[in-house]
A protein has these predicted regions:
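Conserved core of the PLP fold type I
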Residues: 42-206
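N-terminal "arm"/small-domain region of PLP-dependent enzymes with the aminotransferase-like
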Residues: 1-55, 62, 66
Protein backbone atom coordinates (compact mmCIF):
# COMPACT_ATOMS: atom_id res chain seq x y z
CA UNK A 1 0.00 0.00 0.00
CA UNK A 2 0.90 3.66 0.31
CA UNK A 3 2.84 2.96 3.51
CA UNK A 4 5.49 1.13 1.50
CA UNK A 5 6.09 4.28 -0.57
CA UNK A 6 7.14 6.20 2.53
CA UNK A 7 10.73 7.41 2.86
CA UNK A 8 10.74 6.03 6.42
CA UNK A 9 11.50 2.36 7.24
CA UNK A 10 8.33 0.26 7.47
CA UNK A 11 7.72 -3.28 8.72
CA UNK A 12 4.89 -4.34 6.42
CA UNK A 13 2.56 -6.63 8.39
CA UNK A 14 -0.60 -6.18 6.31
CA UNK A 15 0.13 -8.82 3.70
CA UNK A 16 2.86 -10.58 1.79
CA UNK A 17 6.07 -11.72 3.42
CA UNK A 18 7.17 -9.47 6.32
CA UNK A 19 10.63 -11.08 6.47
CA UNK A 20 12.11 -11.08 2.99
CA UNK A 21 15.64 -12.47 2.97
CA UNK A 22 18.11 -11.34 0.29
CA UNK A 23 19.69 -14.78 -0.08
CA UNK A 24 16.27 -16.41 -0.57
CA UNK A 25 15.30 -13.75 -3.12
CA UNK A 26 18.49 -14.56 -5.04
CA UNK A 27 17.53 -18.25 -5.19
CA UNK A 28 14.05 -17.37 -6.46
CA UNK A 29 15.52 -15.07 -9.12
CA UNK A 30 17.84 -17.84 -10.30
CA UNK A 31 14.97 -20.35 -10.55
CA UNK A 32 12.77 -17.89 -12.44
CA UNK A 33 15.60 -17.18 -14.90
CA UNK A 34 16.01 -20.89 -15.60
CA UNK A 35 12.27 -21.34 -16.08
CA UNK A 36 12.16 -18.47 -18.56
CA UNK A 37 15.13 -19.90 -20.46
CA UNK A 38 13.60 -23.38 -20.65
CA UNK A 39 9.89 -23.52 -21.40
CA UNK A 40 7.98 -20.80 -19.55
CA UNK A 41 7.96 -18.50 -22.59
CA UNK A 42 6.47 -21.28 -24.72
CA UNK A 43 3.43 -21.38 -22.44
CA UNK A 44 2.61 -17.67 -22.69
CA UNK A 45 0.38 -18.18 -25.71
CA UNK A 46 -1.18 -21.45 -24.56
CA UNK A 47 -4.05 -22.24 -22.22
CA UNK A 48 -3.62 -25.16 -19.86
CA UNK A 49 -6.27 -27.72 -18.94
CA UNK A 50 -9.16 -26.10 -16.95
CA UNK A 51 -8.24 -28.36 -14.02
CA UNK A 52 -4.67 -27.07 -14.11
CA UNK A 53 -1.30 -28.30 -15.29
CA UNK A 54 -1.41 -32.11 -15.51
CA UNK A 55 2.26 -32.53 -14.61
CA UNK A 56 1.82 -30.46 -11.44
CA UNK A 57 -1.29 -32.41 -10.45
CA UNK A 58 0.56 -35.71 -10.95
CA UNK A 59 3.48 -34.42 -8.87
CA UNK A 60 1.12 -33.37 -6.08
CA UNK A 61 -0.73 -36.70 -5.96
CA UNK A 62 2.57 -38.61 -5.94
CA UNK A 63 3.98 -36.44 -3.16
CA UNK A 64 0.88 -36.54 -0.94
CA UNK A 65 0.41 -40.28 -1.37
CA UNK A 66 4.05 -40.92 -0.52
CA UNK A 67 4.20 -38.59 2.47
CA UNK A 68 0.83 -39.42 4.06
CA UNK A 69 -0.03 -42.88 2.78
CA UNK A 70 -3.15 -41.59 1.05
CA UNK A 71 -4.70 -42.99 -2.12
CA UNK A 72 -5.38 -39.79 -4.06
CA UNK A 73 -5.91 -39.46 -7.79
CA UNK A 74 -6.00 -36.40 -10.03
CA UNK A 75 -9.73 -36.13 -9.26
CA UNK A 76 -8.87 -35.19 -5.66
CA UNK A 77 -6.70 -32.20 -6.63
CA UNK A 78 -8.01 -28.72 -7.42
CA UNK A 79 -5.65 -25.97 -8.56
CA UNK A 80 -6.66 -22.32 -8.23
CA UNK A 81 -5.22 -18.96 -9.23
CA UNK A 82 -3.55 -18.44 -5.87
CA UNK A 83 -4.76 -18.69 -2.28
CA UNK A 84 -7.18 -15.75 -2.49
CA UNK A 85 -9.02 -17.48 -5.32
CA UNK A 86 -9.06 -20.75 -3.37
CA UNK A 87 -10.54 -19.12 -0.28
CA UNK A 88 -13.14 -17.34 -2.41
CA UNK A 89 -14.39 -20.74 -3.58
CA UNK A 90 -14.14 -22.41 -0.17
CA UNK A 91 -15.71 -19.66 1.93
CA UNK A 92 -18.64 -19.24 -0.46
CA UNK A 93 -19.07 -23.00 -0.75
CA UNK A 94 -19.30 -23.53 3.01
CA UNK A 95 -20.52 -20.09 4.13
CA UNK A 96 -23.44 -17.86 3.20
CA UNK A 97 -27.14 -18.62 2.83
CA UNK A 98 -28.29 -22.25 2.65
CA UNK A 99 -31.81 -23.35 1.74
CA UNK A 100 -33.18 -25.84 4.28
CA UNK A 101 -36.69 -26.03 2.79
CA UNK A 102 -38.99 -23.99 0.58
CA UNK A 103 -39.76 -21.64 3.46
CA UNK A 104 -36.59 -21.86 5.52
CA UNK A 105 -32.98 -20.88 4.98
CA UNK A 106 -30.01 -20.54 7.30
CA UNK A 107 -26.90 -18.39 7.10
CA UNK A 108 -23.60 -20.02 7.95
CA UNK A 109 -20.35 -18.26 8.80
CA UNK A 110 -16.71 -19.33 8.72
CA UNK A 111 -15.28 -19.83 12.21
CA UNK A 112 -11.81 -18.40 12.86
CA UNK A 113 -10.59 -20.07 16.09
CA UNK A 114 -8.63 -17.00 17.11
CA UNK A 115 -7.93 -13.47 15.92
CA UNK A 116 -6.00 -11.61 14.55
CA UNK A 117 -6.07 -13.61 11.34
CA UNK A 118 -5.02 -13.20 7.73
CA UNK A 119 -6.34 -9.90 6.38
CA UNK A 120 -6.78 -11.42 2.92
CA UNK A 121 -9.83 -13.36 4.11
CA UNK A 122 -11.81 -10.15 4.60
CA UNK A 123 -13.14 -9.53 1.09
CA UNK A 124 -13.89 -12.97 -0.33
CA UNK A 125 -17.50 -13.48 0.76
CA UNK A 126 -20.43 -12.86 -1.57
CA UNK A 127 -23.29 -12.85 0.97
CA UNK A 128 -24.16 -13.41 4.60
CA UNK A 129 -22.15 -13.00 7.76
CA UNK A 130 -18.53 -13.48 6.89
CA UNK A 131 -16.83 -14.66 10.04
CA UNK A 132 -17.27 -15.62 13.67
CA UNK A 133 -14.26 -15.63 15.96
CA UNK A 134 -13.25 -15.60 19.60
CA UNK A 135 -10.55 -13.66 21.40
CA UNK A 136 -7.36 -15.65 21.97
CA UNK A 137 -5.71 -16.38 25.26
CA UNK A 138 -2.48 -14.37 25.40
CA UNK A 139 0.32 -16.10 27.26
CA UNK A 140 3.53 -14.35 28.32
CA UNK A 141 6.53 -16.42 27.23
CA UNK A 142 10.31 -16.21 27.14
CA UNK A 143 12.40 -16.45 23.99
CA UNK A 144 16.00 -17.57 24.37
CA UNK A 145 15.88 -16.51 28.00
CA UNK A 146 14.46 -13.06 27.29
CA UNK A 147 11.12 -11.82 28.61
CA UNK A 148 8.70 -9.52 26.84
CA UNK A 149 7.31 -12.03 24.35
CA UNK A 150 3.83 -13.50 24.13
CA UNK A 151 1.93 -16.24 22.30
CA UNK A 152 -1.67 -16.45 21.11
CA UNK A 153 -3.48 -19.62 22.15
CA UNK A 154 -6.96 -20.82 21.20
CA UNK A 155 -9.52 -20.29 23.97
CA UNK A 156 -11.20 -23.67 23.62
CA UNK A 157 -13.62 -23.02 26.50
CA UNK A 158 -15.07 -20.05 24.60
CA UNK A 159 -14.79 -21.79 21.24
CA UNK A 160 -16.58 -24.99 22.22
CA UNK A 161 -19.44 -23.07 23.88
CA UNK A 162 -19.93 -20.73 20.92
CA UNK A 163 -23.70 -20.38 20.25
CA UNK A 164 -23.27 -20.35 16.46
CA UNK A 165 -21.42 -23.66 16.63
CA UNK A 166 -24.11 -25.30 18.75
CA UNK A 167 -26.88 -23.93 16.51
CA UNK A 168 -25.37 -25.28 13.28
CA UNK A 169 -24.57 -21.82 11.95
CA UNK A 170 -20.90 -22.54 11.24
CA UNK A 171 -20.06 -23.84 7.77
CA UNK A 172 -16.34 -24.49 8.29
CA UNK A 173 -13.44 -23.84 10.64
CA UNK A 174 -10.46 -22.04 9.11
CA UNK A 175 -7.04 -21.22 10.54
CA UNK A 176 -3.68 -20.13 9.16
CA UNK A 177 -0.54 -21.91 10.29
CA UNK A 178 1.59 -19.83 10.59
CA UNK A 179 -0.72 -16.86 10.89
CA UNK A 180 -0.08 -13.74 8.85
CA UNK A 181 0.76 -11.13 10.09
CA UNK A 182 1.53 -12.23 13.68
CA UNK A 183 3.64 -15.30 12.86
CA UNK A 184 1.74 -17.25 15.52
CA UNK A 185 1.87 -21.02 14.98
CA UNK A 186 -0.92 -23.18 16.38
CA UNK A 187 0.50 -26.16 18.26
CA UNK A 188 -0.05 -29.78 17.25
CA UNK A 189 -2.30 -30.16 20.30
CA UNK A 190 -4.43 -27.19 19.25
CA UNK A 191 -4.71 -28.55 15.71
CA UNK A 192 -5.80 -31.95 17.05
CA UNK A 193 -8.54 -30.32 19.15
CA UNK A 194 -9.72 -28.24 16.19
CA UNK A 195 -9.81 -31.38 14.05
CA UNK A 196 -11.88 -33.18 16.69
CA UNK A 197 -14.22 -30.18 17.00
CA UNK A 198 -14.74 -30.04 13.24
CA UNK A 199 -15.48 -33.76 13.09
CA UNK A 200 -17.89 -33.50 16.03
CA UNK A 201 -19.94 -30.89 14.17
CA UNK A 202 -19.55 -32.45 10.72
CA UNK A 203 -17.81 -29.45 9.15
CA UNK A 204 -14.48 -29.14 7.32
CA UNK A 205 -11.30 -27.80 8.89
CA UNK A 206 -9.50 -25.57 6.38
CA UNK A 207 -5.81 -24.87 7.05
Amino acid sequence: GDALKSDKPVNMLGGGNPARIAEVNAVFADVFSKLAAEHAVENIGNYSNPQGDAALIDALTTFLNREYGWNLTADNIALTNGSQNAFFYLFNLFGGKFKVSDDLSVEKAILLPLAPEYIGYADVHVEGQHFVSVKPKIEAVEHEGEEGFFKYRVDFDALESLPELKEGKIGAICCSRPTNPTGNVLTDGEMARLDALAQEHGIPLII
